[in-house]
Curated annotation (Swiss-Prot):
It holds the Pfam family Coq4. InterPro entries: Coq4, Coq4_euk. Belongs to the COQ4 family. The gene is coq4. It catalyses: a 4-hydroxy-3-methoxy-5-(all-trans-polyprenyl)benzoate + H(+) = a 2-methoxy-6-(all-trans-polyprenyl)phenol + CO2. GO terms for biological process: ubiquinone biosynthetic process. GO terms for cellular component: extrinsic component of mitochondrial inner membrane. This is Ubiquinone biosynthesis protein coq4, mitochondrial. Component of a multi-subunit COQ enzyme complex, composed of at least coq3, coq4, coq5, coq6, coq7 and coq9. Pathway: Cofactor biosynthesis; ubiquinone biosynthesis. Its main location: mitochondrion. It comes from Aspergillus terreus (strain NIH 2624 / FGSC A1156).
Amino acid sequence: MSILGRRGAAIVARELPLPASSSSILASHPRAFSIFSRPQPKYPGHVPLNAIERGALAVGSAVGALMNPRRADLIAACGEATATPYFIYRLRDAMLSDPTGRQILRDRPRITSTTLPLPYLRSLPENSVGRTYAAWLDREGVSPDTRDEVKYIDDEECAYVMQRYRECHDFYHAVTGLPIFVEGELALKAFEFLNTLIPMTGLSMFAAVRLKPAERERLFSIYLPWAVRSGLGSKELICVYWEKILEKDVNELRRELGIERPPDMREIRRMIREQKKREKERLKQAE
C-alpha cells in the first residue's frame, strides 16, 4: 500500500464511530490517577493533593513556619502534609482501640466558644479542668475559635482526628501551664511529639535556633527532659473526652494521665528579669 493509501485509511478510521461494545469497555476502565493528577474532594472543604503538591506543601510550610513560628496557618498546613500516610492513621487507630476514643469518634464533638461557653467554664470550681482551661485562655488572651479547619488530609475520619488534636491543643497548654510564646510552644510540641508522634510537633524543634541563648539553654536543660518523661509516660491524650471531665480536679487528672507539671515558665522568666534589674541597679549605684 502506498503512503497515500495508508494516510487515507487512517483518516477513515478516525472518522468512523467506535462500536458500542468498545465504548463501554473504555468507559469501564477510566484512566488511573498519576502523581500529576488531582483526585476529587472526599468531604466538604477537602483540598486533595497529588504527591508532588503534598511534598511541596510540606517543605514550603515547614520552611515558612521556621522563619516565622507564629504563622499558625503554616504550622497547620505542615502538620497535615506530613501526617500521612502513617502517623494520622496511627493516632486514629489509638482512638479506635480505646473505649473513650471510640466514643469521641462516634460523637465527633467540636471545641469552640459556643460548645464550651467561657462564662460557664469560669463558674466551675476553682481547681477544676474547665476553670483551669478558662483561666489559661484569659491569661494568654487566646480563643478556641481560631483553629484552622483541616483540609489536606484525604481520609474523612482521619481529618476529624487531626481537627480534634488541633482543638485539644489548648487543653494541653492549660493542664501543663505552658504559655503561648515560642519557648512555651516548643516545650509543649516536644511533649506532644512523644505522645502523638505527629511529625510536625517534632519538626517544630528546629525553631529552637530562633531562641535567645538563655531561652535555648533553659529549653534543653529543663523543659525537654520534662517533655520526655511526661510525653513517654502519659496516656494517649487524643483519647481524653475533655468535654465530659470539665468539673474534675485538674491535679487528679494529671495523676491519672501521668503528666508531671513542668516548672512555671512565666515565673522563671519574671525572676530572671527581676534579677537582671537588681544587678543593673547595683552596678549603677557602684558607679
